[in-house]
Amino acid sequence: MNKEFDEDVFYDLRYDVYFKNFFLNNKMLAGFLSLLWNTKVNPEDITYDNTESVLPLGKKIIYDVVANVTLHKKEEINVNLEMQNLYHKYLNERMAFYAMRKYSDKLKRANEFGNICIESIWFLGFNDSKFHDNNTEKWLSEYKLTNEDGNVLTDKFRIDQIFLKNKDKCPIIELQEFFKLCTSLDKHNLPEFSTEYAKEAKEMLLKMNNDKALRAESFSHEMFLRDQKAQFKTAREEGLEEGIAKGLEEGLVKGKAEGKAEGIQE
């Protein structure tokens, strides 16, 4: 039996379907952002944006969660949340591309090109895989466009990475508890929380895990990802075998040619 169909399996927030559905609840997203930004975010000040961006030649970027947040009735922030479970060789470039693409989309919609004023673009990645960073002990890294003196070019473009493996280093107790929901969990031994937000998040995740339709959707999505990963692995192995065979063949040809040349010289 596939473990995803086992009723004892608890889907945590690393699973794409559960991550998306959790943060598509404006109360849960508002609570999370309020803690992370240390400022009040109201659920009613959050609207959700299109998660697709069409590229040239008809290709698309599919984002996990995209929301527009209004702070203090004046500041507009476009938030893109992504869960990254698998190591990606070009993860840095991928994050930058996602964020810049969303920034570009907003620029295209701007009405006054003489004095462009768009909301800030903020990309937040939850990273549960290996990630190259100068300080791997951080729980959070912040990236901005700066010059060699550290002067910020624009405050409307930012990329942050949360390193889940270092969640215990987070000084915000509410988030430190919440991040435990982004790790492998035992349904019969779920962590107990002392903070209000983590308790509410746990309760919602329990309800989501009792949703049979959501479990089926998550299972289908995970099977697709596994099949895709298996195809990539097979392609790499076949490419490696082909490369080795070709290398051996070329080596034999070269060896014969060199041996023949040496024989003629002698």
Predicted regions and their residues:
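Elongated, amphipathic alpha-helical interaction scaffolds
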Residues: 1-266
